[in-house]
Amino acid sequence: MSSQAASDNPFDPAMWERVPGFDDLTDITYHRHVLDGARQPTVRVAFDRPEVRNAFRPHTVDELYRVLDHARMSSDVGVILLTGNGPSPKDGGWAFCSGGDQRIRGRTGYQYASGETAETVDPARAGRLHILEVQRLIRFMPKVVICLVNGWAAGGGHSLHVTCDLTLASREHARFKQTDADVGSFDGGFGSAYLARQTGQKFAREIFFLGRAYDAQTMHQMGAVNEVVDHADLEKAGLQYAAEINGKSPQAIRMLKFAFNLIDDGLVGQQVFAGEATRLAYMTDEAVEGRDAFLEKRDPDWSRFPRYF
């Protein structure tokens, strides 16, 4: 890596520490933000295959799901920054994620393989790529997921950025391209429907039908990017967003996320929102009275609880 490339790298190792218990990761890196020696409620999850534009294989997706689920279950984490490591050791190019690795895609889907070519495919394992489960995890977790697009966001990588709550993009290197129709694939779920919500139907259809590459500023104008940031400052900007979000009420943030989701997520969204509302109700004195009355085999006394209008 050249000194210029190193100086432009938005990742500053001094601001992060590896999350313990994940030393076996090969395709993903997982860090916790550290400020003045104190662990902060922000984590960084990054694709770590820069030599192939951070394309994912089944093993990559499994690791991604594992770390995201760990962040979801960590009560001291409020924001997840999702990005890609780089630059490429081959040509110095940058990528967030370029989608599925076409070299191990078979007729039954993306194959588990010991290597990176077709002859290393394990025929005994189903060609199942769990990227849709990852999308659902991002959508339904009660944490804010911010996508930091530092280079190419293509194909399945484009759909991941769409699924995240917020997107910040590198002014110099971010490129957005929906390649599905170029490789005989299509995202008929979150990657297309939510994109149409963000950009409108006409732009979303243009992005998918034409498969053109767009820079960060164009995507910002379309409505799919929140802010365009100088490349070297991308992760600093992400941390600033995270700090502001983590400075808000955790319960309010999770309810707001599920409220925004509800209009598009049907009965599933209603169930998620209702579950959170029920959990809030359990915290009230009124709910405690109902529980205690049941356990004590008496009629509940609701007289001290006003019927608000």
Swiss-Prot record:
Residues the entry annotates as binding substrate: 53, 98-102, 110, 152-156, 179, 185, 282, 297
SUPFAM superfamilies: ClpP/crotonase
Catalytic activity field: 2-succinylbenzoyl-CoA + H(+) = 1,4-dihydroxy-2-naphthoyl-CoA + H2O
Enzyme Commission number: 4.1.3.36
GO MF, any single term: 1,4-dihydroxy-2-naphthoyl-CoA synthase activity
InterPro entries per record: ClpP/crotonase-like_dom_sf, DHNA-CoA_synthase_MenB, Enoyl-CoA_hydra/iso, Enoyl-CoA_hydra_C
Residues at the site labelled Important for catalysis: 110, 180, 282
Keyword set, alphabetical order: Lyase, Menaquinone biosynthesis
Gene Ontology biological process: menaquinone biosynthetic process
Domain of life from the UniProt record: Bacteria
Pathway recorded for this protein: Quinol/quinone metabolism; 1,4-dihydroxy-2-naphthoate biosynthesis; 1,4-dihydroxy-2-naphthoate from chorismate: step 6/7; Quinol/quinone metabolism; menaquinone biosynthesis
Pfam families from the UniProt entry: ECH_1 (PF00378)
Family in the record: Belongs to the enoyl-CoA hydratase/isomerase family. MenB subfamily.
Role description: Converts o-succinylbenzoyl-CoA (OSB-CoA) to 1,4-dihydroxy-2-naphthoyl-CoA (DHNA-CoA).
Protein's name in the database: 1,4-dihydroxy-2-naphthoyl-CoA synthase
